[in-house]
């Protein structure tokens, strides 16, 4: 479960892993909802500077809030936005190199409008000594949403490169430290917060550190791609894990902090608990 922007945006994800010989299949179901979005399009009384309808004075009917005009609060309405997604990923070895293929379907509703989209991701990973490197090509060759109006909202391909390396500058018994870095490159997501911008190309990085004690307690900290600090804690038991992540708000703090809670359960552990209860 994830809560963002002080609870305005909420999302839930449920994931499963199905063992199929040596090629596991990962299934993920996603829901995201945004409620109480204000719609102010019908509030403007666009009657011009004199505030009287039908006089054709300057400003009447121009769609702009001019001096002398006002808003009708009774015309304020609210709508919501919902997304339901499905993602399936499988892993295969091609000439000894692990190759991942991900297929995704997204259903999107915005007020009275509806859209449907599909996409394909490709990825592979490689271990070089103690360093794990992964590369993901998203939306290959391209993907997008088809709206009920016939409009196609396209999404071009992007690339993500990640690396993980364990290290121990100071040896502490039963303690392991992991470092991680992620680079995201795109040609359509260029924005003012991009760390590197060259024409339409953008490149953003994220960094993280994770310390694990006795494979039970995890402490995490880092910086995301928009230079916001992140942190988190994780506790692991046999067949059961709880993780919490925290993301700071923007500089002004107007959008609130983000909170992410993850719960991981082992199916084998659940079945063993059920078996014990039945025996009792």
Give residue ranges: language-model regions:
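Subset of outer-membrane beta-barrel
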Residues: 1-280
